[in-house]
């Protein structure tokens, strides 16, 4: 009985060894293949935008004019930098972004079938929140609404920048009521407003839209944002 058990264990160990070898042989090349097939910088961390074959050639041409087709140098600040250094970096970077967007959008016409207005609401602490509202002309009945939260890392840019004005009005031209919220950034031209000031502004804007759905002629509300605005969109929904 002892000899039989030992032989069985030896056979089982041998089979296990073969299975492990077969596993690594079969999976190894496939893993390398999958790694090579990953798109963009997931597959090549040193891939420059100009070498990404997925990019629209017209977009590449536009970005190349501003030197945005190559790998950007690392920023001079990090999470380890002082608050003062980070705020100085934000203050220096913001005009560059705003100038870029102004240059791009100065030759792009805005829709001519949109009505725009600005409203100022107040939160429970008396803080004023500016809302930019765009709606289509000559449309009756209730319409879906989009609360748009702009990008900028929650640190720079404003809802009144030309790229965001164009985006909101383009959506409104497609029969949506679009509200852009001027939330407080943590730096830049809108000042140093520590978190969660900006998030609270977004939440109060959403509450105001919901409370005034009848007056505004709104059927449903969608919250949308990109980049830092996408972060605030998720946070607004969660809170």
Report each predicted region and the residues it spans.
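N-terminal cap/lid segment of alpha/beta-hydrolase-fold proteins
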Residues: 93-141
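N-terminal targeting or regulatory segments adjacent to alpha/beta-hydrolase or S9 domains
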Residues: 27-109
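Short beta-strand element of the alpha/beta-hydrolase
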Residues: 142-152
């Amino acid at each position: 009985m002892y000899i039989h058990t030992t032989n069985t264990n030896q056979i089982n160990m041998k089979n296990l060894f073969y299975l492990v070898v077969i596993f690594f042989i079969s999976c190894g090349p496939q893993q390398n293949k999958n790694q090579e097939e990953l798109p963009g910088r997931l597959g090549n961390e040193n891939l420059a935008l100009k070498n990404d074959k997925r990019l629209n050639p017209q977009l590449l041409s536009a970005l190349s004019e501003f030197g945005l087709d190559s790998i950007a140098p690392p920023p001079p600040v990090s999470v380890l930098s002082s608050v003062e250094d980070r705020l100085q970096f934000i203050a220096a970077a913001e005009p560059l972004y705003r100038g870029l967007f102004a240059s791009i959008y100065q030759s792009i016409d805005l829709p001519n079938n949109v009505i725009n207005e600005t409203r100022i609401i107040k939160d429970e602490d008396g803080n004023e929140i500016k809302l930019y509202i765009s709606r289509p002309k000559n449309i009756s009945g209730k319409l879906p609404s989009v609360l748009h939260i702009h990008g900028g890392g929650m640190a720079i840019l404003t809802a009144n920048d030309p790229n965001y004005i164009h985006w909101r009005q383009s959506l409104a031209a497609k029969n949506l009521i679009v509200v852009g919220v001027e939330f407080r950034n943590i730096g830049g031209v809108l000042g140093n407003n520590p978190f969660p000031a900006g998030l609270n502004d977004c939440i109060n804007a959403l509450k105001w839209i919901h409370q005034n759905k009848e007056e505004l002629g709104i059927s449903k509300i969608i919250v949308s944002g990109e980049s830092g605005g996408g972060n605030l969109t998720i946070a607004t929904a969660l809170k």
